Amino acid sequence: MPKVGMQPIRRQQLIEATLQAVDQVGMGDASIALIARLAGVSNGIISHYFRDKNGLIAATMGYIMSMLNEGVRARRQALTDDSPRAHLKVIIEGNFDASQVNGPAMKTWLAFWASSMHQPDLHRLQRINDHRLYSNLCCQFRRALPLYHARKAARGLAALIDGLWLRGALSGDAFDTDQAIRIAYEYMDLQLAKQER
């Protein structure tokens, strides 16, 4: 009989082992056996908690996305300035948070994006994440710009954030968070300046 309260601990242990496995060998070679070994559990535990490897991958991405949302939320709560610019800055910073630009997270994101084109559950998660970023950006730009320009600015900034993240992840060097944030801020400021015209 399982110990009461072990499920959240065990699930987190398996998610962290999945991140470690993907970092070490990639998504394709991150077998259930390897993940279980890294977590120090039997293979059957993964099936018990997640059904299969796809369920574990979806849970791992859910965890990474929740870390992204938490990074933005924590920054938003610390704001003393309620301007659209301040809110846009925390969205940008949250997307380049250490939880999103470390090796295991970046490799898992990259593998997730590739897999999401073929697996409906992962595709659904990707659409949710994409819509959340766009919606949050559009909401803040809308406070300063007409709807058409707000939508256009939100699409552009979302694409820039993803592009900067992707280039940083694929560079092979340490992710230059400061540079990525500076470039995104410059784009944001160019868009917000349109309200003054």
Swiss-Prot record:
This entry's Gene Ontology molecular function terms read: DNA-binding transcription factor activity; transcription cis-regulatory region binding
Spell out the InterPro entries in the cross-references: BetI_C (IPR039538), DNA-bd_HTH_TetR-type_CS (IPR023772), Homeodomain-like_sf (IPR009057), HTH-type_TetR-like_transc_reg (IPR050109), HTH_TetR (IPR001647), Tet_transcr_reg_TetR-rel_C_sf (IPR036271), Tscrpt_rep_BetI (IPR017757)
Give the domain of life. Bacteria
Q: Organism, per UniProt?
A: Pseudomonas fluorescens (strain ATCC BAA-477 / NRRL B-23932 / Pf-5)
Q: Does the keyword Phosphoprotein apply?
A: no
Binding region for DNA? 31-50
UniProtKB keywords: DNA-binding, Repressor, Transcription, Transcription regulation
Q: What is this protein called?
A: HTH-type transcriptional regulator BetI
Name the PROSITE patterns for this protein: HTH_TETR_1, HTH_TETR_2
Its biological purpose is as follows: Repressor involved in the biosynthesis of the osmoprotectant glycine betaine. It represses transcription of the choline transporter BetT and the genes of BetAB involved in the synthesis of glycine betaine.
Presence of the UniProt keyword Ion transport in the record: no
Give GO terms for biological process.
glycine betaine biosynthetic process from choline; negative regulation of DNA-templated transcription
Residues in HTH tetR-type domain copies: 8-68
Pathway listed: Amine and polyamine biosynthesis; betaine biosynthesis via choline pathway [regulation]
Q: Which SUPFAM superfamilies match?
A: Homeodomain-like (SSF46689), Tetracyclin repressor-like, C-terminal domain (SSF48498)
